[in-house]
């Protein structure tokens, strides 16, 4: 569950929140990510702010995954080339080919993917690459308003891989049970701000951050076959936000990741 980044909107870390919600249902999530390049807070930045140890030795990540249903695979620990270009990427502060490569280079050898792309033109080539790499189920998404995730303010273009076949669909937000909001209402801030707001979502606070987390979580749960429809996925996602399941998953990840330090 990851986005390419580079959409220019600097939203909250939606894929990170989504990963925690999905994992709370027992679905194993190997979250692959890096530090911020063009945004104010990358997935590793906000996870660090939340108290999670992102520098788990690669050989211990599987143990974390088995104990908590989620692990964070910090890209520089697995891909030496990413480490060498990190400084340059941080200096130029714009999207590069690594925004596209990163989401497709998950070292966990995962077979199911929900990936957001910053450009609609990337959906077809990226999902074809995933297909050639042996992925079983995958959704590539890009919203009409430019987000690298499913939007709650406009329709979203979806390329779906299943059973070796790729289908193209459009997800119409007005046909789904979510509260629409403007992009300006899901913009994030620095790592501290994002961590605070993400925690509020996991505590059950009802706001636009919750809505976009819920719809993306619903998509992930549907993509991997845990539920049959986006509507069912929404019910499950909101349930784990309301009953504390997603928050407990975060707490478990904090405890286990630091235990494995």
Residue map of PLM features:
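Glycine-rich anion-binding loops and their surrounding alpha/beta cores
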Residues: 7, 11, 26, 48-55, ...
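Active-site-proximal loop->helix
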Residues: 35-53
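Short linear Ser/Thr-Pro motifs
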Residues: 13-15, 39, 43, 240
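Short, surface-exposed recognition loops or helix-turn segments adjacent to catalytic cores
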Residues: 32-35, 57-65
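Active-site cofactor/substrate anionic-group-binding motifs, chiefly glycine-
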Residues: 1-33
